[in-house]
Regions:
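Asp-based, Mg2+/Mn2+-dependent phosphohydrolase catalytic module
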Residues: 1-20, 33, 87, 113, ...
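N-terminal helical cap/lid subdomain that shapes the substrate entry/recognition surface
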Residues: 4-114, 118-122, 130-134
Length: 217
């Protein structure tokens, strides 16, 4: 084990990359429970307006919003399900916010904690894109991450599930990018080179392999 760690640190010394930044939602937090609760809240709020919505309709509205790179996916879904009627959309949106505003459904992705430990043991600096740091503390993983990376963007690898919110800005800043296809954004596909990640993964094992490839590149 010690020889493995020393070998990994030697690899890092030769690499341009010093840090890995994780967008927590999707890559670290599965978000399955959150997405199910949100979709249920949207259906319930529509029902209170007399709009009958089934899971297939919610899934279709979600897919349309994701494919269109909608800046506010929830609003886009509600607009689709409510036929775009402004006052109805506003009421449904308020109800959904009331139903989900205090919801905290953090689900640590299986295997990700062990990967974080291995990456840190290799000498990589780990960053977290997560506005609610207490969620990481409750999940027992806050200690893996630093508040201030102190690493130039060109020395960073970004792992995120969304092309629009994660991959595009990271590429623009000069980071290497890995799309973790999961949950609501698993079907999002790039429309141009600027939206295309350096790699795509669907599980933790693939993620670790790609990170090592980038470090070795």
């Amino acid at each position: 084990m010690r020889e493995h760690r020393e070998g990994a640190r030697g690899l890092l010394a030769l690499s341009r990359y010093r840090a890995v930044i994780f967008d927590i939602g999707g890559a670290v937090d599965l978000e399955f429970a959150w997405e199910m609760a949100l979709d249920g809240a949207i259906a319930a709020a529509c029902g209170l307006e007399g709009i009958r919505v089934d899971p297939a309709m919610v899934e279709e509205a979600s897919g349309q919003a994701v494919a269109a790179f909608a800046p506010d996916v929830v609003l886009s879904m509600i607009e689709t399900l409510c036929g775009g009627e402004p006052s109805t959309v506003a009421r449904v949106m308020r109800r959904v916010e009331a139903m989900t505003g205090q919801l905290d459904a953090f689900q640590l992705r299986p295997g990700i904690e062990d990967l974080l430990k291995r990456l840190k043991d290799q000498g990589l600096v780990l960053g977290a894109r997560e506005p609610r740091w207490e969620r990481l503390e409750r999940a027992g993983i806050a200690s893996f991450f630093v508040d201030d990376l102190a690493v130039a963007p060109t020395g960073c690898i970004l792992v995120g599930d969304r092309l629009d919110a994660d991959i595009i800005p990271a590429k623009g800043a000069g980071m290497a990018t890995i799309q973790f296809r999961s949950g609501r954004w698993r079907r999002q596909r790039p429309r141009s080179a600027a939206e295309t990640p350096d790699a795509v993964v669907t599980d933790v094992a693939e993620l670790e392999a790609v990170i090592l490839q980038l470090l070795n590149g």
